[in-house]
């Protein structure tokens, strides 16, 4: 697979799980003989939500919630057939969303 590149994007709410998954992917790719670039941390998306504490008089009293979506990017440069097979067999945690582009 000369000249090809596999781009893996990881997303999740817990950065520790994402970093652990990224480390597993990098180790698997290096073991199979491919070059790896990353994991590259991408900007964290923060969504904030403000909700009234009381449905009646206290309009100024609001409670704030936020969700943080952490992202990592891994490029596998010149993957071999063994690399693709090993990545298919890899078992990753359920808190990680994985997008793969070839």
From Swiss-Prot:
InterPro entries: Ribosomal_uS10, Ribosomal_uS10_CS, Ribosomal_uS10_dom, Ribosomal_uS10_dom_sf
GO biological process, one term: translation
Highest taxon of the lineage: Bacteria
Disulphide-bridged cysteine pairs: none
Keywords assigned: Ribonucleoprotein, Ribosomal protein
Pfam families according to UniProt: Ribosomal_S10
GO molecular-function term, one example from the UniProt record: tRNA binding
GO cellular component: ribonucleoprotein complex; ribosome
Family: Belongs to the universal ribosomal protein uS10 family.
Assembly, per entry: Part of the 30S ribosomal subunit.
Function: Involved in the binding of tRNA to the ribosomes.
Annotated protein name in UniProt: Small ribosomal subunit protein uS10
Organism: Opitutus terrae (strain DSM 11246 / JCM 15787 / PB90-1)
Lineage: Bacteria, Pseudomonadati, Verrucomicrobiota, Opitutia, Opitutales
